[in-house]
């Protein structure tokens, strides 16, 4: 029996569900929700690649509210997208094309926002002694460095693969 035979959790291959559970454990170990990891794991391997909220709830033995909440989180992180199908009132989700590159681009945006917040903090400190502003400067400088490094790496990856977001 293969994943193509349906989205029923009991019908999925044990190795597939083991992978899905490992993704959940990985996310949980990173202080995210286990269900978000399982949802991402399932969308990495399911067929068809587009899954309704109901199909996801069945496949993952999860509540529709849990699917909705965790799908919103994964959308915010840039990994998945919501789809509308003409004539169908259900909500569908799928992995975004180049999902992990998109996720890294979202992380770059978050780094830029945190740099801006560090600048707000530095302005608020005004003429405070340098030892008081040191932590904010370190935060801003590291984030600026990481933003450049990750941006450059994504650019090289896109050139190498010939793919864009």
UniProtKB/Swiss-Prot annotation:
InterPro entries: HTH-GbsR_regulator, WH-like_DNA-bd_sf, WH_DNA-bd_sf. Keywords: DNA-binding, Repressor, Transcription, Transcription regulation. It comes from the Bacteria. One of its GO terms (molecular function) is DNA binding. Induction: Negatively autoregulated. Residues 53-76 bind DNA. Controls the expression level of the Mmps2-MmpL2, MmpS4-MmpL4, and MmpS5-MmpL5 transport systems. Also controls its own expression. Acts by binding directly to the promoter regions. Disruption phenotype: Mutations or insertions/deletions that inactivate MmpR5, or decrease its activity, lead to increased levels of MmpL5 and MmpS5, and to non-target based resistance to azoles, clofazimine and bedaquiline. This is HTH-type transcriptional regulator MmpR5. It comes from Mycobacterium tuberculosis (strain ATCC 25618 / H37Rv).
């Amino acid at each position: 029996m293969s994943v193509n035979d349906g989205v029923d959790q009991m019908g999925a291959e044990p190795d597939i569900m083991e992978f899905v559970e490992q993704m959940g454990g990985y996310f949980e170990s990173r202080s995210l929700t286990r269900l978000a990891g399982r949802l991402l794991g399932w969308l990495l391997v399911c067929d068809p690649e587009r899954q309704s909220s109901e199909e996801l709830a069945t496949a993952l033995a999860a509540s529709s509210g849990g699917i909705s909440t965790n799908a919103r989180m994964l959308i915010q992180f840039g990994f998945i997208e919501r789809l509308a199908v003409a004539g169908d009132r259900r909500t569908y989700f799928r992995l975004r094309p180049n999902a992990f590159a998109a996720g890294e681009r979202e992380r770059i945006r978050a780094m830029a926002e945190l740099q801006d917040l560090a600048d707000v903090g530095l302005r608020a400190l005004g003429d405070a002694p340098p030892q008081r502003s040191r932590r904010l400067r370190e935060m801003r400088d590291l984030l600026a460095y990481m933003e450049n490094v990750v941006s450059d790496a994504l650019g090289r990856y896109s050139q190498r693969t010939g793919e864009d977001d």
